[in-house]
């Protein structure tokens, strides 16, 4: 008899629970009976990985120069930093991807708020890649065919875009955000966080690929693999640009990715970061998701080294900078996006 009563009570409780849920007591539609139940209709299935990006798990690492760079270490000592999870493009932005950006702006100028008041020539004058960098950046270097063909010819579609300054990279991130979220909103999906340039700390953390001690993105300390092949696109020696297989830039996935699945975190082209330049930035910023923003500092951080740099600039801890308005044949960028959700590297089940 007791078992029957307990069974009947359980059935009654379950029936009442479903009835209350149907009435909206626990966030469903209908009345909430004056109870605090939250707002209904806010289902969230997790954040999808944007196309062309990889998710970088949260973690802690020691940010700073390698042991063989004692001069830089005296200015900005190594520091333990924690980085939250984020997404990052697995390759540098290519010529063809940047071309889509230019085409979309030209075809729909009125659709983007960030173009309001910029003037009719803003796209071509400020955003279109500066192809003259292939001639202007190098003394007495004239008649280079890349001036004519690098951005325009389909043979270079999968090569990293160059001749783009920090400001243009920022506008690209604004457009990419609007382009994605306009589509998602029109299809009843929640909007994604903004695309942006990675912070310098995020960039270095991602470049290390989860390794505790990594002189280069592949680990190190050597720049060749066991078969003698170069592991990145850079300048191996004076006047020697071709030992790595490419005299200039290389297609964005020509070399092995690091352990996070990121290509060309060393070499090919240097990459704009969000941060303003300060020689002692690592020492003075906070130790959790740091970004050094100084609106009065026109110099912006560039990381990774390029096809025209020696191996020192390929090291994960080596820092560099360019003026935010400068365009070069050796600087490009990739985008990042904040991950919304649990930041840990291992998700709870």
Predicted segments, located by residue:
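Functional-site microenvironments in short loops/helix caps that host divalent-cation chemistry
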Residues: 24, 29-34, 55-56, 62, ...
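A short glycine-rich, aromatic-capped structural motif
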Residues: 45-146, 160-168, 267
């Amino acid at each position: 008899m007791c078992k029957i009563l307990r069974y009947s009570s359980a059935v009654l409780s379950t029936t009442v629970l479903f009835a209350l849920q149907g009435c909206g007591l626990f966030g469903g539609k209908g009345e909430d009976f004056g109870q605090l139940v939250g707002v209904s209709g806010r289902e969230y299935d997790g954040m999808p990985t944007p196309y062309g990006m990889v998710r970088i798990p949260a973690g802690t690492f020691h940010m700073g120069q390698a042991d063989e760079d004692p001069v830089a270490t005296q200015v900005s000592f190594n520091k333990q930093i924690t980085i939250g999870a984020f997404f990052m493009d697995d390759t540098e932005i290519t010529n063809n991807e940047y071309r889509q950006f230019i085409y979309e702006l030209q075809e729909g100028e009125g659709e983007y708020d960030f173009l309001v008041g910029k003037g009719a020539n803003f796209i071509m004058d400020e955003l279109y890649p500066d192809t003259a960098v292939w001639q202007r950046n190098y003394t007495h270097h004239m008649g280079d065919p890349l001036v004519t063909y690098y951005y325009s010819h389909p043979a270079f579609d999968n090569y990293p875009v160059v001749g783009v300054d920090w400001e243009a990279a920022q506008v690209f991130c604004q457009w990419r955000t609007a382009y994605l979220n306009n589509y998602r909103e029109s299809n009843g999906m929640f909007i994604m966080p903004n695309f942006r340039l990675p912070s310098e700390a995020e960039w270095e953390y991602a470049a290390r690929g989860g390794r505790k001690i990594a002189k280069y993105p592949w680990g190190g300390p050597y720049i060749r693999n066991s078969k003698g092949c170069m592991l990145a696109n850079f300048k191996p020696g004076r006047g020697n640009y071709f030992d790595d297989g490419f005299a200039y830039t290389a297609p964005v996935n020509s070399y092995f990715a690091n352990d996070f699945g990121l290509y060309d975190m060393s070499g090919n082209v240097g990459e704009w970061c969000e941060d303003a330049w300060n020689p002692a930035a690592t020492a003075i910023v906070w130790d959790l998701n740091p970004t050094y923003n100084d609106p009065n500092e026109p110099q912006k951080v560039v990381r990774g080294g390029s096809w025209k740099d020696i191996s020192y600039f390929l090291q994960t801890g080596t820092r560099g900078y360019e003026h935010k308005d400068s365009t070069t044949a050796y600087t490009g960028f990739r985008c990042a996006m904040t991950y919304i959700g649990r930041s840990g590297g291992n998700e709870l089940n």
